[in-house]
């Protein structure tokens, strides 16, 4: 069984699945779209490094192994049709909804749930919505929330070693064959905001037409390689 999304192709092969990263980059619910040669391999390796780091911290991910240049061998998950966002600072849609200045600290990590639905612009929902709509139970939602905060704080610590600031990050979770909530999808500049002294190292470079996003993605990969080897 194969499935192709905006930025990845999933191929289920027996007990495992292959997650192939494409060179596509999108923004605005897919309305903005380009192909950047080499992006897929950058995001695949970045994800592999960061998920391996999380596994060493005792956090469950779907990663089994990285198959260069652009493929991850993963545990198949029954994915929740959700994006789970953790915010450490005000940015993006949070500022549009609630105001404030980009980069302002939030007093505690803020967790938000969004239904994956481009046509409805990924509506934000609360835990009660998830249960009423049959998307996830309250217990599953709490497990996702707990894991998302734990992962975010671990990644924040990882990047702080090089004086980079993790502003916010988006996750996707699923259930393994035993019903455990497990981190799936990817962790890359496609899914987080990463800054250093005002410089942007994430997809906002593409969203805002601020230069060459591929250059910044490469720099993040080099950063992850360097920190991983320490």
From Swiss-Prot:
Source organism superkingdom: Bacteria
SUPFAM superfamilies: SAICAR synthase-like (SSF56104)
Coiled coil ranges: none
Keyword field contains DNA damage: no
Catalysis performed (reactions): 5-amino-1-(5-phospho-D-ribosyl)imidazole-4-carboxylate + L-aspartate + ATP = (2S)-2-[5-amino-1-(5-phospho-beta-D-ribosyl)imidazole-4-carboxamido]succinate + ADP + phosphate + 2 H(+)
PANTHER family found in the cross-reference section: MULTIFUNCTIONAL PROTEIN ADE2, SI:DKEY-6E2.2
Protein name, as recorded: Phosphoribosylaminoimidazole-succinocarboxamide synthase
UniProt lineage: Bacteria, Thermotogati, Thermotogota, Thermotogae, Thermotogales
Gene name per UniProt: purC
């Amino acid at each position: 069984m194969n499935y192709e999304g905006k930025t990845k192709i999933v191929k289920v092969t027996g007990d495992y699945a292959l997650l192939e990263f494409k060179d596509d980059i999108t923004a605005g619910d897919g309305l903005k779209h380009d192909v950047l040669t080499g992006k897929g391999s950058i995001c695949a390796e970045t994800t592999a490094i960061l998920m391996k780091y999380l596994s060493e911290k005792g956090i469950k991910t779907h990663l089994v192994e990285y198959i260069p240049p652009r493929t991850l061998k993963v545990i198949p998950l029954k994915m929740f049709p959700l994006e789970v966002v953790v915010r450490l600072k005000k940015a993006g849609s949070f500022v549009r909804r609630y105001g404030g200045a980009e980069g302002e600290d939030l007093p505690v990590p803020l967790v938000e749930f969004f239904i994956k639905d481009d046509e409805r612009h990924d509506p934000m929902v609360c835990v009660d919505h998830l249960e009423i709509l049959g998307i996830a139970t309250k217990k599953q939602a709490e497990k996702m929330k707990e894991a998302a905060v734990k992962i975010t704080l671990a990644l924040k610590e990882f990047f702080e070693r090089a004086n980079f600031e993790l502003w916010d990050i988006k996750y996707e979770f699923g259930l393994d064959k035993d019903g455990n909530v497990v981190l799936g999808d990817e962790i890359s500049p496609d899914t987080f905001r990463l800054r250093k002294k005002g410089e942007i190292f994430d997809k906002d470079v593409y969203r805002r037409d601020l230069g060459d996003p591929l250059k910044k993605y490469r720099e993040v990969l080099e950063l992850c390689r360097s920190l991983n080897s320490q």
